[in-house]
Amino acid sequence: FLSIDLAHALALPLYDPDSQVMVNGKPQYEVVDPSKPNSASSRQRPAMGSGLIGGSGVVLGAIDAKVIVAANGGSDLIYVPSQDGALVRKLIQWLATQDYVGGIFADSSFGHIPGALSLATVGLEGAAVTPRPSIIVAFKTFASDPQNPLQSAVQIADTTLQEGQGMHGSFGRDNTYNNMAAIGPDFKKGFVDVAPVSNADIASTLAYLLQLPVSSHGHFAGRVLEEALAGGPDRVPFQHHQIGSSKTASPPRATFLEYQSTAGRSYYDRACFAEPASRDVSEVQAGHAPASCSR
């Protein structure tokens, strides 16, 4: 749905990168037009949710789309091939007005943008040679039962799956608070780890137990879960953090991020996009969110 909404907001044509048709003997990405019935040359919705916005829709040669939306379930990736900072800011200003947005993150090369935290804030800027999204937008999550939020979570998702079929990829706590269990002679018995743990820690811990010399090939993003190992410490120190972007002008909204840290590594809990009316805006503008994302 996001590609449809963005194309409408920008008044640009929308093409489906996952569906092609022949036009005058040449392959063309199929036109997406929700206002018209499906036909031999156009469709109402992208097949997989992704979209090429603007340009000619020609398949062969360089893609000339102004904006590319990669649908990703609970979050979508937005690429601006021209690296046009003014366009990126325009997109974020528009996203900030949508009630389904749960957080906005932008490439730090575009500088400070009200309403958005940088991709670097969540560890998504590195040395990879693959294209980096200009913007990542997380969709809103909420609980149908506030007394049991993890088991009653609802998330908005840009996907072809139907309601009840399940989805992930959002930045809600129901997505990031997964469980992990380890059994074996190297692990403590009946131990419950209260420190933050992520999937990235599995490889580091297994490499340590198997004494694999991985340091010669680089380094892992995760840590060794020493507190869970037999003979390890009872606990490791960790901290909770909250940060927020500066607010947009109208409506006044900001992206807030909650995360934990230990051993120099960050573990991201959740993000939300909210009006900071009840918050100290000066703290938000300084990069600190004085309240949680609990909803």
Protein language model features and the residues they cover:
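Non-catalytic, well-ordered alpha-helical segments in soluble enzyme domains
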Residues: S75-A106, P185, V194-A230
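Short acidic (Asp/Glu) and glycine-rich catalytic loops that position anionic groups and cofactors
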Residues: A70-S75, A181-F187
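Secreted, luminal/periplasmic, and some membrane-associated catalytic domains
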Residues: F1-E163, P276, E283-S294
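Low-complexity, glycine/alanine/valine/leucine- and proline-rich hydrophobic stretches
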Residues: Q151-D186, D201, A286
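Polar, surface-exposed loop/tail segments
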Residues: G102-I135, V194, Q211-S246
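Phosphate/adenylate-binding glycine loop and adjacent helical scaffold
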Residues: P233-R295
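Solvent-exposed soluble domains appended to multi-pass membrane proteins
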Residues: D76, S144-P146, G169, T176, ...
